[in-house]
């Protein structure tokens, strides 16, 4: 537990310096590499005092011009959300020296432009994260790079997600909860699952993992959830050569299972990865059915709670 708390603090300090430290935000250091170098030093420490000492020594390696005067924030009605920097004032946790170092960085003179974030007019003010190494040759398990990806994401949302104030859960607690999940990754599938679980915490369907297999197959029907059931409600328009496939499913059919797994079970299994429940339901049912020709669906037509007919079908309709 102490190691998780130490790594969480490292995440916060590293991200804070990435976006606030004048030299770091200017791209003068390989900031990923600096994280990977310091990370082992934050494990198995005897006390938080020793942890804070290690972090102070690390921070002091990156010099900058200190600002004289009292720090103040610009008060404006146009500011909806300010970054949460209260944690750097917590001397009971950070100690006086570390807290003072972080406040000096907060108050430092720095250029408006950042090497890592583009907020230009061409992007309509949206944050575009630049100069982030992809590490495409990374294999799993690799704890250092697994944590790097989590730290990148957590801090990007910490400082640039405009709807962070709407999150119902404490963002610091979310970090503590997800570090163990990223430490347990043993494969690429585990890695993608951990990312999906983390992304789901912000409840925004614009966020997700993109890429992967293309959609080669299509179920030629519209599936909607009605009273908690996956119900076929209408058809898609098909090319003439596929017209005979149209009769496989009928409006009113209820999808019960996919690959022998009950729909309710599928939804329960993937809910932790859902950043939007309606979209999750679609992706859980319609997309898996359509992804390839080997999917099997068992359906039944229900009218007034009476089962009229059952179907055992394998979709092989190619787009």
Residue positions per predicted region:
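Flexible, low-complexity junctional segments that flank or bridge functional domains
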Residues: 1-319
